[in-house]
Amino acid sequence: MMTSFFDQFASPYLLGIPLILVAMLLPWLLFPAPTSRWINNRLITVQTWLTGRFTNQLMTPLNFSGHKWALLFASLMVFLITINLLGLLPYTFTPTTQLSLNMGFAVPLWLATVIIGMKNQPTIALGHLLPEGTPIPLIPALIIIETISLFIRPLALGVRLTANLTAGHLLIQLIATAVFVLLPMMPAVAILTASVLFLLTLLEVAVAMIQAYVFILLLSLYLQENI
């Protein structure tokens, strides 16, 4: 019996062993590996086309030196989309509802973009901390504000992904609970609520894909500032 709505976000254990690693490795088993044949099957063709489209959208604003990040960004985006969608299945666990995991993705990648900027073009990277045309009396305050906003970026990335997925899962569970409670007492209202639940589930599927795309898109924008 579930004692709390937030119990669904707790990492599952089996014989004292956390199963979050299994939940993170499972998505890679669902994608077919490319074959050496001249003609691939439809699933591989669609997978390649979608990955290429997403990668093209992400890499178009970047110059040539940033294209080396294409494989990393595309792989991470497909990984996040798959994890988010698998988490919508009944009796499954969504690792991306854990802030620690999302911060583990966000902080190293954000830090890598900052280090690249400081290494390749330190003057421009530091110039982002002070907007052009700032009055002299406001310079110290703006530098502090821009520095704080720079360090908040990875936190915003992780919290945005965690909060959106957590809120969606909670809404689905609340409405599903309401359907089961209303079914014996008011069947008509329960059916109407179930239709709302169906629409909300479709919306959550879209949110699961959009949030993964936004996560990678913001990382690509941070990279664009530093290359």
Swiss-Prot record:
Its main location: mitochondrion. The chain crosses the membrane at residues 13-33, 69-89, 98-118, 132-152, 179-199, 202-222. It is found in: Mitochondrion inner membrane. It is a multi-pass membrane protein. InterPro entries: ATP_synth_F0_asu, ATP_synth_F0_asu_AS, ATP_synth_F0_asu_bact/mt, F0_ATP_A_sf. GO terms for cellular component: mitochondrial inner membrane; proton-transporting ATP synthase complex. Disulfide bonds: none annotated. The keyword Transport applies. Keywords: ATP synthesis, CF(0), Hydrogen ion transport, Ion transport, Membrane, Mitochondrion, Mitochondrion inner membrane, Transmembrane, Transmembrane helix, Transport. It catalyses: H(+)(in) = H(+)(out). GO terms for molecular function: proton channel activity. One of its GO terms (biological process) is proton motive force-driven ATP synthesis. The keyword Ion transport applies. PROSITE patterns: ATPASE_A. Subunit a, of the mitochondrial membrane ATP synthase complex (F(1)F(0) ATP synthase or Complex V) that produces ATP from ADP in the presence of a proton gradient across the membrane which is generated by electron transport complexes of the respiratory chain. ATP synthase complex consist of a soluble F(1) head domain - the catalytic core - and a membrane F(1) domain - the membrane proton channel. These two domains are linked by a central stalk rotating inside the F(1) region and a stationary peripheral stalk. Component of the ATP synthase complex composed at least of ATP5F1A/subunit alpha, ATP5F1B/subunit beta, ATP5MC1/subunit c (homooctomer), MT-ATP6/subunit a, MT-ATP8/subunit 8, ATP5ME/subunit e, ATP5MF/subunit f, ATP5MG/subunit g, ATP5MK/subunit k, ATP5MJ/subunit j, ATP5F1C/subunit gamma, ATP5F1D/subunit delta, ATP5F1E/subunit epsilon, ATP5PF/subunit F6, ATP5PB/subunit b, ATP5PD/subunit d, ATP5PO/subunit OSCP. Belongs to the ATPase A chain family. This is ATP synthase F(0) complex subunit a. The gene is mt-atp6.
